[in-house]
């Protein structure tokens, strides 16, 4: 059976991997491309209807394509490993090779067996972007312009520009760059929340360097998460053909509006097999607006660790159906603690909107500006109550950055990860996702798959708690208590400060 492989859609001079983006037009052309199904009492033949559908796609392509651009990123260093959201350059040391599982390798941020067999050098990263303002703001994926040296942008008419980075957001894999030009054609955003399964979807991009390629499919699913591509996931799934080089390009509706930014595919070979993922336009636009105005993204913070609800938990906590998110821990001093949230509360709605999944709630809170008041509907001991909470700014990641400087990448552990690793569902700790070869962490014995249980003799159960501990111990060596299997050990990471 073909093994599943998550790919981001990048194209390089030696190797291609998938990515996505989006674009806009000067005017909303909705009225121009509506399909004429009937005219008065006159019946429309099947042939005429098909012609109208075809013309509709043609009109979208004609109006949107001028707003889609070809991006070439010449990184600061020429010889680099293949970049992707799940495979950060230079992070190696996989103790789990015996699983022989491509998805497992991707999850741990490691090169797949296929990638290890390919040349690991490149001269340029090539992808797609789309213009969102007439004065030259361009949206693409973060992984297209990551580690940028020179960025070249080629318009549909062949004009070439050098671009500068305006803002990056690796947590959603979005980026904004800018070219010095005026009166450009640009794309507008549609409402991704209004999408229905089966709606038409049109992708425009530069697969394998073939510029202005248009493909058509449908919306296959919404709200895809737990793919471990980026931190905040709420992907639209489509069968519109997306291939290496499409990264950062737009996914459009039949009105020519951007409903998503193409980002990744599932594939056994690195190419298209009918499953592609796009960042929904509502999430993308909120991130993009902040990148353009501030150069960075400010996210809301509640201060809870959550667990998905399954049918057994729904019965145990007397829920009317399988929905909501279970609070497994409350961060000390957080908005959640101050508002009175407790361990084992089940959050079933926020501001009147039902919590369909843990990821949906997490994404919604993260998109709220600090100071936003949100009313949480809680099921506690079988009773329903409402608790108002004022969201604050998500804590800085100084602690995580300190670990990254030492060569370690971490993430919160989830029930899905526990299942994958054969751990108990209630396992607490922080998962080591990857370790950079030759780093202080690698030399000290830190390895992917280990669980960090304590830092500087303080128990930690979330990345937020890790941040707080490390922020209070700047300039000091870091003492980690880690476990792997039944073995617990202590590791000292020496600080450079």
From Swiss-Prot:
SUPFAM superfamilies cross-referenced by the UniProt entry: PDZ domain-like, Trypsin-like serine proteases
GO annotation terms (biological process): proteolysis
Enzyme active site: 143, 173, 247
Gene Ontology cellular component list: outer membrane-bounded periplasmic space
Record GO terms (molecular function): serine-type endopeptidase activity
Record-given protein name: Probable periplasmic serine endoprotease DegP-like
Organism of derivation: Chlamydia trachomatis serovar D (strain ATCC VR-885 / DSM 19411 / UW-3/Cx)
Domain of life: Bacteria
EC number: 3.4.21.107
Family from the record: Belongs to the peptidase S1C family.
Location in or out of the cell: Periplasm
């Amino acid at each position: 059976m073909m093994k599943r492989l998550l790919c981001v859609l990048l194209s390089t001079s030696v190797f291609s991997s998938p990515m996505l983006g989006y674009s806009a037009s000067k005017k909303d052309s909705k009225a121009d491309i509506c399909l004429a199904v009937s005219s008065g009492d006159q019946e429309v033949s099947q042939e005429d209807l098909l012609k109208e559908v075809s013309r509709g796609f043609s009109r979208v392509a004609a109006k949107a394509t001028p707003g889609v651009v070809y991006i070439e990123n010449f990184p600061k260093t020429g010889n680099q490993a293949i970049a992707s959201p799940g495979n950060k350059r230079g992070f190696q040391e996989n103790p789990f090779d015996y699983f022989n599982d491509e998805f497992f390798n991707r999850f741990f941020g490691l090169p797949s067996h296929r990638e290890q067999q390919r040349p690991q050098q490149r001269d340029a990263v090539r992808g797609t972007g789309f213009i969102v303002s007439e004065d030259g703001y361009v949206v693409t994926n973060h992984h297209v312009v990551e580690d940028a040296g020179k960025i070249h942008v080629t318009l549909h008419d062949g004009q070439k520009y050098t671009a500068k980075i305006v803002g990056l957001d690796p947590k959603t894999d979005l980026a904004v760059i800018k070219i010095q030009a005026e009166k450009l054609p640009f794309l507008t955003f549609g409402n991704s929340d209004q999408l229905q399964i089966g709606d038409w979807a049109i992708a425009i991009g530069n697969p394998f360097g073939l510029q202005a390629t248009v493909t058509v499919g449908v919306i296959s699913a919404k709200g895809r998460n737990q793919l471990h591509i980026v931190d905040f996931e709420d992907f639209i799934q489509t069968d519109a053909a997306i291939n290496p080089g499409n990264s950062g390009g737009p996914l459009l509706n039949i009105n020519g509006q951007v409903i998503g930014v193409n980002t990744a595919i599932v594939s056994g070979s690195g190419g298209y097999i009918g499953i592609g993922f796009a960042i929904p336009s509502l999430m993308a636009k909120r991130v993009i607006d902040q990148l353009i105005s501030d150069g960075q993204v400010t996210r809301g913070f509640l201060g809870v660790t959550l667990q998905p609800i399954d049918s057994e938990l729904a019965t145990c906590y007397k829920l009317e159906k399988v929905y909501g998110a279970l609070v497994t821990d409350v961060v000390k001093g957080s908005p959640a603690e101050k508002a009175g949230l407790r361990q084992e509360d089940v959050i079933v709605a926020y501001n009147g909107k039902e919590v369909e999944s843990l990821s949906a709630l997490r994404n919604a809170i993260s998109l709220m500006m600090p100071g936003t008041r949100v009313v949480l509907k809680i099921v506690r001991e079988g009773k329903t109550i409402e608790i108002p909470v004022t969201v604050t700014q998500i804590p800085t990641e100084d602690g995580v950055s300190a670990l990254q400087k030492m060569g370690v990448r971490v993430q919160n552990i989830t029930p899905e990860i526990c299942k994958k690793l054969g751990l108990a569902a209630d396992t607490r700790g922080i998962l080591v996702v990857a370790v950079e070869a030759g780093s202080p962490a690698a030399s000290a014995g830190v390895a992917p798959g280990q669980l960090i249980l304590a830092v500087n003799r303080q128990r930690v159960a979330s990345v937020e708690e890790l941040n707080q501990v490390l922020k209070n111990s700047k300039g000091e060596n870091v003492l980690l208590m880690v476990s792997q299997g039944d073995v617990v050990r202590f590791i000292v990471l020496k600080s450079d400060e």
